[in-house]
Amino acid sequence: MAAISARPLTQKALKVASPDTLHLVADAPVPTLDQDDSVLIRVVCVAINPVDGKSAELSPTPGATSGTDFAGIVVALHGDAKSRTETADTIKTGDRVMGFVFGNNPHVLGNGAFAEYVTLPRRFLWRVPDHMSLEAAASLPVGIASVGMALHYLHISMSSLLQAVSRSIAAASASQHHDGAFDSDANVFILVYGGGTSTGAIAIQILKAAGFHPITCCSSESASRAKRLGAAATFDYQSATCGRDIRDYTNDSLTLAIDCLSESASMAICYEAIGSAGGRYVSLDPFPVRGCVRRSIVPDWICSFTQFGQSIPWAPPYNLDERPDDHRLAEEWYHLAQKLLDAELIEAPTLEIRSGGLLHVPEGVAAVKLGQIKRRKLVYHISEEALP
């Protein structure tokens, strides 16, 4: 396997050229292994996320490599990482891994998923389980990270999640029936608005494994899959009584909601669905302030890039200071999520796989931005070469 000194010096990469424009560069520097646990990965597949197009349009950083989600093969480790004692859980050269990176990053222009190589700290990578393809793996990282961050912002502790997930894994390994009901969480509903989205589907599965009762708003086309993944009930977001129906179903007990669409209409339904005692609402994007119509509900929103321990120097409202708690939480969450992946408790979304490499990725970014990709995740092969 390639040593650090043998890695190539240049690579192909998609760079932000101007607002809403990505340009393929043939001789971009390969990112360096600066941190003591840095890992260099040969990118095999990437997935397209809404943030890829949104950030390039609203807060472009000319010269920065774009892209978030990827899966690939570890080709090199920082010297300090190589010298550490290896365990069964240690990521090493030759491993298949997946992760997401802060693309379009003003702090680090040369690191993004839309490239032949990417680097990340080892603690922010997941090993791809043997049962999972690299195409499927590329579709999951930012969704898994976002769900973990959302649960943190809902004030659900990692220790309680770990205990519940461990019971789910034990039940699954013993081929026992698992109904999702564990101890104090047995009657706790959590609303996932957008159960047909990739992140919403991941949230349903994780909440089910953690012993909650996930319920979801989604389209009628997405309802059957949401139920198969673990939703206790589905509600059609187009119904004029959607919010009231959820409140009736939960007997006015709903206190927690994750909004994967983060629009005025989705926020309104979440606010109507949350019971009279109030609760917490977390969106995956900045929410419209005019939607805060109930003082008993505490709203917040997440930006998963805060997990890396840096500020986010994008244009408002995405200009965020460092959030040390998010960074600490992420390290715990990655360990827990690896257990879920290994136990086959997280299923990848339906995929649309395209070839053509980096040259055609901007077409996919535009398609996602225009809403042309629905109920599936767009994945591109970056490297068609079989790696050792």
UniProtKB/Swiss-Prot annotation:
EC assignment: 1.-.-.-
Record: residues binding substrate: 142-149, 304-308
CDD domains in the record: enoyl_reductase_like
Induction: Expression is positively regulated by the cluster-specific transcription factor tenR and is induced during cocultures with the natural competitor fungus Metarhizium robertsii.
Name of the top EC class for this enzyme: oxidoreductase
Function summary: Trans-enoyl reductase; part of the gene cluster that mediates the biosynthesis of tenellin-type 2-pyridones, iron-chelating compounds involved in iron stress tolerance, competition with the natural competitor fungus Metarhizium robertsii and insect hosts infection. TenC collaborates with the hybrid PKS-NRPS synthetase tenS to catalyze the assembly of the polyketide-amino acid backbone, since tenS lacks a designated enoylreductase (ER) domain.
Name of the protein in question: Trans-enoyl reductase tenC
